[in-house]
Amino acid sequence: VLTFNRDVIESKVAKISEYLELKDKSFDGFLKWILDLREKFDIPHKLSSVIDEKDLQIDRLSKMALEDPSTNGNPKKLSIEDMKIMYQHSMSGNLF
């Protein structure tokens, strides 16, 4: 989600990086910090590490996610296709 929204959140991420006193205050520095934190807490890099792709039902989940009221808080307007792409990237571990 971070990398999907990068072009609209990059300046906000710089402010967060400043607050966190990260050495590298760029978007990439913040992303590296998040990925390192995820590794520290043993959070898998790919959703496919915890769920079988055939069980995911991407179409159904994408529709449900788009209908969720919290989706309106995303910095970018999302389409059903955007949701599907994010789920596919979550499964593969591809960061866009």
Task: Please name every model-derived segment.
Residues 10-96:
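C-terminal charged capping/lid subdomain of soluble metabolic enzymes
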